């Protein structure tokens, strides 16, 4: 595994792509849960050009995601901090360069659906996700962003952000 030196001087492993995070039935179930609700049960955020929500239904998948995270991040003390569904569309869709700052030490960005790929950049390297793929990285330490939204007239991208932290960071 390659390691990247962060601006802080700390070394972190390169992000990891997980193909087919969920089996096909679970993936379809998640899509069918969110697609009908996008513009009715979700808040619109014009800063990112997205509809988003953090519904309790995502907790149903926490054990599955947590098992992957513990292996990838080599830690048995991880716990979910929060999950967020985001649907991007239109000319305002964007993700500026940032690091996370809200209990997002470990991040799994899961591509639920997309009209076409919209690469995520993590520490200056592009990662292309297919539907049902995820990229795992250190959200609070690795800069990440997306370039211009492709084909804003027709493009739609659904992502779920699974954020995790260490147990002792949550309770203290």
Protein language model regions, located:
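Catalytic core of non-heme Fe(II) oxygenases with the double-stranded beta-helix
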Residues: 88-145, 153-160, 165-172
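A short coil-to-beta-strand element that immediately follows conserved catalytic motifs
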Residues: 75-84
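Secondary-structure boundary/capping residues
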Residues: 39, 77-78, 117
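Non-heme Fe(II)/2-oxoglutarate
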Residues: 1-74
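Short, solvent-exposed loop/turn elements at beta->coil junctions and helix N-caps
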Residues: 84-86, 149-150
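A short, polar/charged loop/turn motif at coil->beta-strand junctions and beta-hairpin connectors
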Residues: 9-12, 79, 156
């Amino acid at each position: 595994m390659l390691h990247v030196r962060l601006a802080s001087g700390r070394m972190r492993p390169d992000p990891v792509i997980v193909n087919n995070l969920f089996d096909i039935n679970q993936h379809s179930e998640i899509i069918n849960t969110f697609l009908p609700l996008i513009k009715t049960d979700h808040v619109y955020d014009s800063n990112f050009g997205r509809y988003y929500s953090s519904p309790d239904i995502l907790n149903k998948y926490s054990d599955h995601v947590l098992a992957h995270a513990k292996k990838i991040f080599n830690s048995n003390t991880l716990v979910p901090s929060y999950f967020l569904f985001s649907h991007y569309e239109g000319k305002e869709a964007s993700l500026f360069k940032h690091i996370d700052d809200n209990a997002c030490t470990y991040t799994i960005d899961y591509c639920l659906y997309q009209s076409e790929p919209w690469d995520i950049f993590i520490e200056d390297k592009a990662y292309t996700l297919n539907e049902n793929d995820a990229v795992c990285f250190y959200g609070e330490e690795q800069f990440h962003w997306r370039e211009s939204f492709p084909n804003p007239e027709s493009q739609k991208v659904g992502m779920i952000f699974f954020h995790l932290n260490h147990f002792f960071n949550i309770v203290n």
